[in-house]
Amino acid sequence: MLRKMTAREIYRCATAYHKIKSRQIIEALYTDFTSWEGLLDFAPTLRAPNGSTISLTKDPAMIIGVAQFQGTDVAIIAQQTPQSAQERSAYNYGLTQADGYGLALCMMDYAEKYGLTLHTFIDTVGGDPFAASAAKLQSWLIARCQARMLSLQTRSIATIIGQGGSGGAIALQLAHRRYMLALSTYSVIAPEGCAAILFRQVTEDTIAAALEILQPTAEHMVQYGIIDAIIAEPPLEDPHYLATTLDSLSAMLTRATTELASAAIDALQQELQDKIARCGRIAEPQPWYRRGRRFAKRLWNFSRPAVTTDPHIADIRRHVFGNSDCTPQACNTVKDADGNVVRHGCGHLFPAE
């Protein structure tokens, strides 16, 4: 029997250079791929919230175009990460830039216009953190991609194939069918970032601890209803790893395409919105739990010692000001009987003395 892999081991696989990449999938499973630059009526521009025009350029970490999947025209949005240390800078270290998300948004519109099923492949550390992407409104573009996928009037399939990092991954994952390769991760933050925030240091131990907290594996995602199914994937050292994984991907995409083709788009939209609404929802407690909780609360209130300090002073205030007689007072705005401001206050707390 194979030993169950830890989250740390799965994360190592998800970030490995020899993990399957989007370009390999497109070359093996699709035919007649045409990049967005070759589409005659594809407009790489967007209107910003302030009314200005955003001109978009090629993002090396994003593959966008149209192709055929088993004879059917589809639109493709795929994130590409480096396959070697030498490719790291060429692919922006696996970080998708604002231009990539802008082009993805344009491709979503294109797919809806021509009734193309949208296939997205997610593999990114996260959104690009540099100033150039911020200047092109990357956070707004990521949010727009998420909203657009939820309202898209064409069928969509999303597959996480490596790293699903932060909002940059969510932007392409809100599809009618959502899958994940077994040796992939999906999380709100990279474990290194989580470790730096929670533990103030990034080591093997803190990364492993962060992964246990984040619970980013495919099994966790199925458990929480964030994906629909896991696509089987052999160990990376398997000599037939690539061929076996491609076969599994092809089978799942074929099955999903057949399912979606027979469903009405309105029903798919409602189903997707219901799935998203259920994410993170905790089951209602059983009646026996409620009764036990009420009993324990009454018992605790009966047995707890009397509070000798002012009950209106929060614990945090006592911690800051101590238990002296100098009760902290808030410097609030003072108004007269008619509601006119007599004295402006900052709201900060000061000792009464």
How should these model regions be labeled?
Residues 122-263:
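Conserved catalytic cores of soluble enzyme domains
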Residues 41, 49-62, 90-99, 169-174, ...:
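Short charge-dense sequence patches
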Residues 1-74, 78-83, 93, 239, ...:
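Intrinsically disordered, low-complexity segments enriched in small/flexible residues
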Residues 15-25, 75-78, 115, 132-137, ...:
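Short low-complexity stretches enriched in small and charged residues
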Residues 55, 64-150, 156-161, 166:
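Cleft-lining beta-strand/loop regions that shape enzyme active-site pockets
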